[in-house]
């Protein structure tokens, strides 16, 4: 099955890497697989690639970890 993943800009990917290294909290908005939009302050933990798709691993304010597909992120700014 072909993925509908659309790679993000390398510069933006680098910004996520820097945020992970600096343990910077981010205010992130994204849509999930059911098209629900989420807005949350998160701490980025890691970047992962799986089956040609890239994900940001984050911890929410409640400590729960999740993976967010990079092309589903709508907006990101420092918290």
Predicted regions and their residues:
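Short glycine-rich, low-complexity segments
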Residues: 1-33
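Residue-level recognition of well-ordered beta-strand positions that form the cores
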Residues: 29-31, 43, 59
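Short acidic/polar mixed-charge low-complexity motifs
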Residues: 34-38, 62-64
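Short beta-strand-centered aromatic/proline hotspots
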Residues: 38-48
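Short aromatic-glycine-enriched beta-strand elements
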Residues: 52-57
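Structured surface patches comprising rigid loops and adjacent beta-strands/short helices at the edges
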Residues: 68-79
């Amino acid at each position: 099955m072909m993925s509908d993943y659309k790679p993000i800009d390398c510069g933006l990917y680098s910004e996520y890497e820097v945020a992970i290294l600096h343990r910077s909290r981010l205010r992130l908005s994204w849509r999930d697989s059911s098209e629900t939009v989420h807005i949350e302050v998160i701490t980025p933990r890691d970047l992962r690639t799986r089956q040609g798709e890239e994900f940001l691993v984050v911890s929410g304010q409640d400590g729960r970890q999740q993976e967010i597909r990079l092309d589903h992120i709508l907006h990101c700014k420092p918290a």
